[in-house]
């Protein structure tokens, strides 16, 4: 109802942990109600070895599977996408995200906090480069997981997610080695020739 009132998609983002139940509540809801699968957007879907398989299942039902960028193993994310394609998963239902400066944490065998940090939003661009360089993926395909797929998932397409007449002028200009050269957001120059022109409210002069 809130989505309809606000003119938004009205989605449910599900923060996945490593619990044994995984996506069982979602599949139960789909089986017992008329809620469309596209309503559910589970994220952190590569957190465990089992979660991707459940994400593939949800994607085949019309839902979405969001993967948090992970550069700890350069071959892991390219391999995960290759596996999804091999299983016939509709690849337009898969997205990548950064967790938006969210915290990450590791715990010892007794459940005590061992370390904590921040997930940098810059991991999204780094993951894109990883898919192209380490995964030998075509840049046009790699972009979809960060652009058009995400825009469709949030029902912001066609205003967002692609370059076309009438769409928001959101553009990235890349150098020959995939270095980020220029960023344009809704027609406004944010980064030009590697020089930052616009900063956020809480950003310092770094």
What is each residue range found by the language model?
Residues 73-75, 148, 182:
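Short secondary-structure capping/turn micro-motifs that flank functional sites
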Residues 162-206:
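C-terminal cap of metal-dependent C-N hydrolases
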Residues 1-108, 113-114:
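Active-site core of metal-dependent hydrolases
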Residues 80-85, 156, 188-191:
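Short low-complexity, flexible loop/linker segments enriched in glycine and/or proline
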Residues 86-173:
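His/Asp/Glu-enriched, well-ordered alpha-helical/loop segment
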Residues 77, 151, 202:
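Short Asp/Glu-rich motifs
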């Amino acid at each position: 109802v809130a989505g309809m009132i606000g003119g938004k998609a009205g989605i449910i983002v599900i923060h996945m942990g490593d619990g044994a139940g995984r996506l069982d509540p979602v599949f139960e809801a789909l089986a017992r109600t008329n809620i469309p699968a596209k309503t559910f957007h589970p994220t952190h879907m590569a957190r465990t070895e089992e979660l991707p398989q459940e994400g593939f299942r949800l994607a085949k039902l019309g839902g979405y599977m969001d993967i948090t960028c992970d550069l700890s193993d350069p071959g892991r994310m390219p391999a995960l996408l290759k596996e999804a394609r091999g299983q016939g998963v509709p690849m337009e239902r898969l997205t990548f995200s950064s967790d938006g400066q969210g915290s990450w944490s590791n715990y010892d065998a007794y459940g005590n906090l061992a370390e904590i940090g921040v997930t940098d939003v810059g991991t999204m661009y780094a993951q894109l480069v990883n898919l192209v360089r380490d995964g030998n993926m075509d840049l046009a395909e790699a972009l979809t997981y960060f652009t058009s797929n995400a825009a469709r998932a949030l029902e912001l397409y066609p205003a967002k997610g692609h370059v076309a007449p009438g769409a928001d002028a959101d553009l990235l200009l890349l150098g020959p080695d995939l270095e980020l050269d220029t960023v344009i957001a809704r027609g406004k120059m944010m980064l030009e020739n590697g020089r930052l022109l616009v900063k956020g409210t809480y950003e310092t002069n770094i």
